[in-house]
Amino acid sequence: EHPECDFEDLAMDFMDIRKRVYVFPKMGEKAMFVAIPTSSGTGSEVTPFAIITDADTGTKWPIADYELLPNMAIIDADFMMNQPKGLTSASGIDALTHALEAYASIMATDYTDGLALMATKNIFTYLPTAYDKGAADPVAREKMANASTMAGMAFANAFLGICHSMAHKLGAYHHLPHGVANALLIELVMRYNADPAPVKMGTFSQYPYPHAKER
């Protein structure tokens, strides 16, 4: 909607002071933003975030502003049935990482925790089946679609952690799928997070592993 905007004004390092003063242009005045995901992973259809890769330098620039939030999200698993196995696994791990980091976030709330935990449960239950059977198991595809969106809703409000920060750099430098970069880092990040807050991290995941004694 705003071709006059300079991308350099939007793509800034996380600690760049300009982020505190730059006003993102008002969106939605010419058209409604309807997002229809075709993979079960990013949750972008319900988040205010975008990642833009600079083709010349390979740098991945994260952009965050609620003007980027779609007006409507249509979650229809029919658009996701024929994801290849590589996309299914990488995007599924991305969704799981969203849920885990939103749950561990210092900005987590009862609302985001509920979404993150249910997303985690469904991913553990249905990602292996979605990977193995693909379109032959539409229930698994639907559950993964819902899990991805729930994880997106969780981290849109609780935000993410250092796993995603490092995964963006790792993926850009080594040309890795984002979900694969997350998969390489998430265990180390969880161990790091568990050191000061073992009780909360012990809750991951309650379903195939023992329950934490307390929240």
Where in this protein do the model-derived segments appear?
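Glycine-rich phosphate/pyrophosphate-binding beta-alpha loops
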Residues: 41, 149-182
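Glycine/threonine-rich beta-strand-loop-alpha-helix active-site module
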Residues: 1-78
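Gly/Pro-rich interdomain helix-loop hinge
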Residues: 173-215
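Active-site pre-Tyr helix/loop in NAD(P)-dependent dehydrogenases
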Residues: 39, 99, 189
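Amphipathic alpha-helical segments within well-ordered protein domains
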Residues: 128, 167-171, 187
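Glycine-rich, charged/polar anion/phosphate-binding loops
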Residues: 20, 57-59, 82, 167-172
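Carboxylate- and glycine-rich phosphate/diphosphate-binding segment that chelates Mg2+/Mn2+
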Residues: 46-158
